[in-house]
């Protein structure tokens, strides 16, 4: 199975301006993400950016980078531009790896690509991980997903879904027998679907939840979800996240790449 990786890397960030260029043990964050993506076995890794500084940084390391429009509403829209400009065939599998996840497990990238390859009925694939603690379920910054019996996403939400009414009413923890899944923000698509996605009308529900993948479900497409044993890596959204990731890379450089 062959697949490509596209890393959307916007310069603007409300909390950490220029986030893709922040230093992590001597390399820009986006370069760390590229290295993890290459370790997944991807046939091609492309950074899609909207800023010349990111373009210059990636090029200086000899990696593939493409300037894209600054007007895209989401990373998926940015990736769709790459697919169109590169002329990739409709059946090409493209994995969206977030540019702020320098600790992402390369095996997870391959797992999600493989999941989509194995499910011809799905237009997209993503991943989830079982949650074991009530605070995480109640945390709106942790997105939850509910699956059908074929492993397709029924819905994504920042709310606790499914809601264990009786257990929570009795101040109990998560009841056994009904796993609650944390969505992991990695996506695989077929290039042909990305061309169609760019023309899909945004849905009110995606704005309400601030979750772009809901547009796909709203329009009736299927998303196959890989249940992984690999806990999601720490992304970088705050100064505290950045400090943690730096400490992990510095202390375990040989393990990380």
From Swiss-Prot:
This is 3-deoxy-manno-octulosonate cytidylyltransferase. Its EC number is 2.7.7.38. The gene is kdsB. It catalyses: 3-deoxy-alpha-D-manno-oct-2-ulosonate + CTP = CMP-3-deoxy-beta-D-manno-octulosonate + diphosphate. Pathway: Nucleotide-sugar biosynthesis; CMP-3-deoxy-D-manno-octulosonate biosynthesis; CMP-3-deoxy-D-manno-octulosonate from 3-deoxy-D-manno-octulosonate and CTP: step 1/1; Bacterial outer membrane biogenesis; lipopolysaccharide biosynthesis. It is found in: Cytoplasm. Keywords: Cytoplasm, Lipopolysaccharide biosynthesis, Nucleotidyltransferase, Transferase. Activates KDO (a required 8-carbon sugar) for incorporation into bacterial lipopolysaccharide in Gram-negative bacteria. Belongs to the KdsB family. It holds the Pfam family CTP_transf_3. One of its GO terms (cellular component) is cytosol. It comes from the Bacteria.
């Amino acid at each position: 199975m062959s697949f490509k990786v596209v890393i959307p890397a916007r310069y603007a960030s409300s909390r950490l301006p220029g986030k893709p260029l922040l230093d992590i043990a001597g390399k820009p964050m986006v370069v760390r993400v590229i290295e993890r993506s290459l370790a997944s076995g991807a046939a091609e890794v492309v950074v899609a950016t909207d800023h010349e500084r990111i373009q210059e940084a990636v090029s200086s390391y000899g990696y593939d980078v493409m300037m894209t429009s600054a007007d895209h509403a989401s990373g998926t829209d940015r990736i769709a531009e790459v697919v169109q400009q590169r002329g990739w065939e409709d059946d090409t599998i493209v994995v969206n790896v977030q540019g702020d996840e320098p600790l992402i497990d390369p095996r997870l990238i391959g797992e999600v690509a493989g999941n989509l390859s194995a499910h011809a009925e799905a237009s997209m694939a993503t991943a989830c991980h079982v949650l074991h603690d009530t605070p995480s379920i109640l945390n709106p910054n942790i997105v939850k997903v509910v699956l059908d019996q074929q492993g397709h996403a029924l819905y994504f939400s920042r709310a606790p879904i499914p809601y264990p009414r009786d257990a929570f009413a009795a101040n109990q923890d998560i009841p056994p027998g009904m796993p609650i899944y944390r969505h992991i923000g990695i996506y695989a698509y077929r290039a042909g679907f990305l061309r169609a996605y760019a023309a899909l009308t945004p849905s009110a529900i995606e704005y309400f939840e601030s979750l772009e993948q809901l547009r796909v479900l709203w329009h009736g497409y299927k998303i196959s979800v890989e249940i992984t044993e690999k806990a999601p890596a720490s992304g970088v959204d705050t100064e505290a996240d950045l400090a943690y990731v730096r400490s992990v890379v510095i202390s375990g450089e040989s393990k990380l790449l």
